[in-house]
Amino acid sequence: MVLIRVLANLLLLQLSYAQESSELVIGGDECDINEHPFLVALHTARSKRFHCAGTLLNKEWVLTAARCDRKNIRIKFGVHNKNVQNEDEEMRVPKEKHFCVSSKTYTRWDKDIMLIRLKRPVNDGTHIAPLSLPSNPPSVGSVCRIMGWGSITTTKVTYPDVPHCANIKLFDYSVCRDAYKGLPEKSRTLCAGILEGGIDSCKVDNGGPLICNGQFQGIGSWEGHPCAQPLKPALYTNVFEYTDWIEGIIARNTTVTCPP
């Protein structure tokens, strides 16, 4: 049953890529309730307001951005409408946090990744299912799906009750180098967006997935301010570049090292 559910979710994602996102993530539409069983929401014990998103890899592990780390993190699974609890909705706390560098330092172009082991595994449900790591590297020109509870307006922060989804395109990294001063010649990040502007990830979407051609290829890292401006794509941590590190940590391999 779990395999059937995962395959059905992947089929739904593929169908989503065939649709054009044309409305208000920014510039998107409300996600279908069955489209994002792997999407998780992060908040702290003191605040119920979501500050980041993440992706469920299996019953015990979540992948998100290093910039999403906080004290007393709470992770919610199976959430759609923040004000309406799903019957299979669950909450967990971290047991372990793994960063690509021991100091937890990261930059806007490198090592913005955090792997969380849950204190207690989550249960499979209608609205809870994992998303696999990518089996192939991403291809420039791919249509990618973004999603999250981030702001849906640029000039004034407006957080929706339900996650928004949108389609964007994957560009060569040089496009982001042209858009933002100070980016190094090479980076383990992906550049994605809409050059005309109007569609983009935004505040609180950090840590959420970038899904290209049905594969989990990126983690929301940072975007221009304000969001969704022309010629200002967002940057996403390249998940494929970190798969060996991720799989090693999950397998309890104490010798695994982060990519240089």
From Swiss-Prot:
Membrane-spanning segments: none
Molecular function via GO: toxin activity
Subcellular location: Secreted
Tissue expression: Expressed by the venom gland.
Pfam families from the UniProt entry: Trypsin
PANTHER family documented for this protein: KALLIKREIN-1, KALLIKREIN-RELATED
Name of the protein described by the UniProt record: Snake venom serine protease homolog 1
Native species: Bitis gabonica
